[in-house]
Amino acid sequence: MSSGSDGLSTIFGAELRKLRARERFVLDGQRPSGLVSESIIQSWERCLSRGRSTHECVVPTLLPKHALKHSLRRSQKIFDAAEPELRNLDAALTHTGCVMALLDPSGVVIHAGSEHPASGELVRQWCRVGVDLSEEAMGTSAPGIVMQSGGAAQVDCAEHYFAGHASIRCAAAPILDWHGGLAGILNIAVESRAFGFDAKEIVMTYAASIENRLLRMQPAGYRLIEFHLATDMIGSGFAGLAGVRQDGRVVWINGVGARLLGVSRAPNCDVETIFGIAFDVLRMSDETVLHRLPNGLTVCMSISGSPAHGPAQMHSAVSRDDRLADQHNRLILETLAANDGNIARAARRLGVSRGTIYRAMGTSGSR
């Protein structure tokens, strides 16, 4: 038997085991721990508690026109933030058979990607503007789990609660607003085939970029701190962001920022506690600088004035790359000197490649 056939047999066998596990769970209450994720089991439990049968014929239905109009109007801000990334993602999925959709916090599709020739009929029905993909409407699905758990999810074939959805695979990720609430959900789905790539990772990446664009549109009266380990991430959709009130309280931090800082996304602490620099000092800076955080990480950091003008100011700051590069190289050379010229040790200390050290040395020598 060919390796391709072996792979198909493995996939089919895994899905068959999940299907049987779901039936045993519904009929006998046996929890298939280890075979499917806990979030999926919990979704099955909720569907079962609503009195739903796995053999119901559940098809996507459209919201009434007046309800859809209200949903689209309410979601205009997130659509504006998402539109550039939705175009990019739609183009990337052209030859995959996948369809993508942007959902509002209630699970209603507010934007659907192009219907590519390889896309299946059922998945095209799922990803139509106005379709309700919430758990109450469609049972277990990636968007439904995102709404319940707040985290990214992937649901494959027999993991869906309703048997009629077993040909679908879907992956979804949340998009949060500046209060940490759910602003929207990004979903991609495919029918009667495997994704062929890490769908969950891709949807998380695009959702994070959309979230950053949305966060930059925060209400007036806040300052925006942007930071990252890498210089070229400043001004991108993948930088750490923090929203700061005029009194210096940090009221929200995006996911990247929270991971860099080692804090929660809603710390409600002052800037100095979180970043190790006084707010009055930071807000006087009009350029991107290198700064060492309280946890020891050295990051590039910038603060904008009125968030309404944040992206323009950030672009202006980032355009002064020469001064930032000088600081970057100086930090590398100081660390190299402190390690007696040991390049490998300095690279480990800074968390950079040895090539970065060599480039900094070459830049210094050419001046």
Where are the predicted features?
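Intrinsically disordered, low-complexity terminal regulatory regions
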Residues: 1-137, 141-157, 167, 176-247, ...
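PAS-family sensory domains
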Residues: 110-111, 261, 350
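PAS-family sensory/regulatory modules and their coupling/dimerization elements
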Residues: 158-159, 167-172, 273-319
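An active-site-proximal beta-strand-loop segment
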Residues: 162
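PAS and related sensory helical modules
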Residues: 261-271
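Bacterial C-terminal helix-turn-helix
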Residues: 322-367
